[in-house]
Design a protein with these regions (language model features):
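A SIS-like phosphosugar-recognition module
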Residues: 1-134
């Protein structure tokens, strides 16, 4: 049942020319690299993984109307900075798939919110990798 929900909600991934993954902080940055690699291996869609802070240094130019952006935003000290990165992507017409354990204002910028359970920030990659694998 959860697979059907993922496929229906994340339909912007079908036919995408590229997919951009963003995360802030050491753990989230490494996690988006793994997610991008898995998606490229399975779907043969070009995927790019970037730390959210480096978005303005090139990757933002690749975002056009309908480009899927998968963002990981755990509840940690980087959450407000991640919200800023998501807002920039949304302003350029990206379809935002947000993976977060936060229920606050950051979710209003997402087209799809995949809610994960709250956990210690150092353990969040173990929880957040599951939705990335299901995508």
């Amino acid at each position: 049942m959860i697979f059907i929900w993922f496929w229906r909600e994340c339909d912007c991934l079908f036919g995408a020319n590229n997919v951009i993954f963003i995360g802030r902080g050491h753990l989230s940055s490494k996690l988006v690299e793994e997610g991008a690699l898995k998606m490229m291996e399975v779907s043969y869609i070009p995927c790019l993984a970037y730390p959210g802070g480096e978005l303005k240094h090139g990757p933002i130019a690749l975002i056009e109307e309908g480009t899927p952006v998968i963002a990981i935003a755990p509840s940690d000290s980087k959450l407000n900075l991640m919200e800023s990165s998501i807002r920039e992507c949304k302003a350029r017409g990206a379809k935002i798939i947000l993976i977060t354990d936060h229920e606050g204002p950051i979710t209003r910028f997402a087209d799809v919110v995949i809610q994960t359970m709250k956990t210690h920030s150092e353990l969040s990659p173990f929880v957040n990798i599951i939705p990335l694998q299901l995508l």
